[in-house]
Curated annotation (Swiss-Prot):
Amidated and nonamidated form of Spexin-1 had similar effects on food intake/feeding behaviors. Residues 27-35, 50-102 form a propeptide. The lineage of its organism: Eukaryota, Metazoa, Chordata, Craniata, Vertebrata. It comes from Carassius auratus. This is Spexin prohormone 1. Plays a role in the regulation of food intake and body weight and in reproduction. May also play a role as a central modulator of cardiovascular and renal function and nociception. Belongs to the spexin family. Keywords: Amidation, Cleavage on pair of basic residues, Cytoplasmic vesicle, Hormone, Secreted, Signal. Induction: Up-regulated during female seasonal sexual maturation and after ovariectomy. Up-regulated by food intake in brain areas involved in appetit control. One of its GO terms (molecular function) is type 3 galanin receptor binding.
């Protein structure tokens, strides 16, 4: 009975090893496979990163790869928390005063 378990364990290990080898041989060799992209796949690739062109040649660089979006304000003045809170309260009070009937 113990020999049967050992034989089954060896057979299972050999099967797993053969499966791993067969899958590793069928994996793509290059880092990027050339394929025909569908419109839905292109929209997925665009995503939130603003990608509008996926180059099939990796040596082209980032010339058309991404859109440069402004993400930071041009205002370089740093506001402290107290100034920001005072500004927010002022805006809220003005909005409340404008909403009251005369």
């Amino acid at each position: 009975m113990k020999d049967l378990r050992t034989l089954a364990a060896y057979a299972l290990a050999l099967l797993l090893l053969a499966t791993f080898v067969s899958y590793s041989r069928s994996a793509p060799m290059g880092s990027f496979q050339r394929r025909n992209w569908t419109p839905q796949a292109m929209l997925y690739l665009k995503g939130t990163q603003g990608r509008r062109f996926v180059s099939e040649d990796r040596n082209e660089g980032d010339l058309y790869d991404t859109i440069r979006l402004e993400s930071q304000s041009q205002n370089t003045e740093n506001l402290s928390i107290s100034k920001a809170a005072a500004f927010l309260l002022n805006v809220l009070q003005q909005a409340r005063d404008e909403g009251e009937p005369y």
